[in-house]
Amino acid sequence: MSVRDIRLLGDPVLRTVADPVATFDRELRRLVDDLADTMRDAGGVGLAAPQLGVSLRIFTYLDDSDEVGHLINPVLGPFSEEMMDGEEGCLSLPGLAFDLRRPERVLAVGQNSHGDPVTVEGSGILSRCLQHETDHLDGILFIDRLDKETKRAAMKAIREAEWSNEPKPAVKVSPHPLFGRGR
């Protein structure tokens, strides 16, 4: 178990559709542990494997009781018709957050690190997290879902961000400047 570097916007792995997990072994469980350690260290509420440079369909999240959970090969749906507005950030875009509308509730099904079936019902922040992290597995970043005006502001903020001109698109973000340490 270790804390790894978090990939930043600009790293091609963040725009790649991640591969399904087929082998549930010790190496996979080590990756899940590293995701959890890195997420906690960075003060995030979710972290997907592509954010560590690993193109596999895995993410970790903090549940409503602040416990770390994980989903492998997740599928989302159904989504509630009720929507929620709220500020959303990302460990791969440190220090930035923008208002984004998402469904209030979602059901997520997938597997745990042993290959057993898992179902997670999320509402509020957990729903937002499940949707955000699944987007990462599909090569989608939350800024892709912003309305036109907010996206313009986001692009300006990204260009002005200290990390956007880094020569390497990976940096250890610990703790995340927006969320602080822990939740």
UniProtKB/Swiss-Prot annotation:
One of its GO terms (biological process) is co-translational protein modification. Its cofactor is Fe(2+). GO terms for molecular function: metal ion binding; peptide deformylase activity. The active site is at E133. SUPFAM superfamilies: Peptide deformylase (SSF56420). Keywords: Hydrolase, Iron, Metal-binding, Protein biosynthesis. InterPro entries: Peptide_deformylase, Peptide_deformylase_sf. Fe cation binds at C90, H132, H136. It catalyses: N-terminal N-formyl-L-methionyl-[peptide] + H2O = N-terminal L-methionyl-[peptide] + formate. Binds 1 Fe(2+) ion. Its EC number is 3.5.1.88. HAMAP family: Pep_deformylase. PANTHER family: PEPTIDE DEFORMYLASE (PTHR10458), PEPTIDE DEFORMYLASE, MITOCHONDRIAL (PTHR10458:SF2). Belongs to the polypeptide deformylase family. This is Peptide deformylase. It comes from Parafrankia sp. (strain EAN1pec).
